[in-house]
Every structure is written in C-alpha cells, then in structure tokens.
Amino acid sequence: EVGFDGGTRELARRLGVTQPLIYRYFPSKEDLIRAVYEEVYLTQWDPAWEVLLADAARPLRERLIAFYEGYTAAIFKPDWLRIYLFSGLRGLEINRWWITFVEQHLLRQIAEAVRLDNGLPSTAKTPVSAEELELFWMFHGGIFYYGLRREVYLKPPELSLGRFIANSVDAMLLGLPPVLKRVVPAPT
C-alpha cells in the first residue's frame, strides 16, 4: 500500500509485530526487498515452463501459447504488477533482477527455438546479439502490456487474453523470421 517508501517501523505496525522482530529475520531493508523479490517473483516462475519451451517434439507455436497462458496467469495480478512498477519507479534492483532472469530463462530460449525453426544458426554457434534480444523484448513486452492495461489501468482490452496471446505468437512467428535472417550473422 505504501510501496517501498515505507519504513520498517510502519511496516511492523501494519503487520502487528515489533520492528526488532523484522530485523531479526531481515538484517537490512535490502534483505527484506530481496525476500519480497524471491517470494513475489521467483516463486511464481514455474521451472516446467523451461522444459515446455525446450520440447522440440511439440510445435513452437503450441509451446509459446501454452507458456504465455501459464505465465500471464501467474503475473497478471494487481499486487505483482504494482510491486514491479513501484520498484521500477523507485530505482530498486528488483526490476533489474527480474529483467535479467527473464532474459536468461525465457527470451534467450525463445530466440534459440525461433532460430532452429527457421534454419538459422543455434545460439551456441552465433550468440544472441543485443539487437536480436530487443526483438524478443518487443514481443514479450506487448503481451506484458496487456496485463498492465487490464490490471493496473483498469481498461481491459476488448480481445480475450487467449486470443491476444495466440495473435501475438502468430505475429512474432510470421513476422520475425525475415528480420532475424538479416540480424543473425552466419556462424564464423
């Protein structure tokens, strides 16, 4: 309710505990923020999603739709989105931690799968460039923004989330390959 600007004394009062009790478990405010990150963000990440995305026996479109249906169910919650936005506005590291996590556990995996589906070199042979990574952020960010409109701005899109995800995946899979063929260099 007060974001990350509140002090531990006020937090203790709201929780009905003493401030020393908070410091017993969290020696610093940074430790408390890291615990919030782990609880709010990392516990929402399902490691099975990475297995799903890597399952080349299933069509890529099907894997991406299944992933984003699960992922959006986990993060399109007012508290999750508010904490994410407030921490970003305050310059806290939570956002940088999460962005790094998403790049490592999701976007690079999607880049690899899209490359393989389009006969491009694997990321092991030709690492993902900053330009290529931004193409996948564009795709991912579009889906994320649906949640902001619905949960934060309280202006739900007129298209169902399922249809929006399917359309986003289709647009990426059909539109991105020509750009990737220009952006991804041949292996050396």
What are these regions (language model features)?
Residues 96, 118-170, 179-188:
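Hydrophobic/aromatic-rich alpha-helical bundle segments in the mid-to-C-terminal region
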Residues 62, 73, 83-85, 93-122, ...:
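Amphipathic alpha-helical packing segments from all-alpha helical-bundle domains
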Residues 1-35:
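Helix-turn-helix
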Residues 39-47, 78, 109, 113, ...:
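A short secondary-structure junction motif
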Residues 38, 42, 61-86, 139-145:
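Helical hydrophobic small-molecule/effector-binding pocket
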Residues 49, 75-97, 148-152:
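Amphipathic alpha-helical segments used for helix-helix packing
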Residues 13, 36-67:
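Amphipathic alpha-helical linker/stalk segments
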Residues 29, 36, 40-41, 67, ...:
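Hydrophobic/aromatic residues within well-ordered alpha-helical segments
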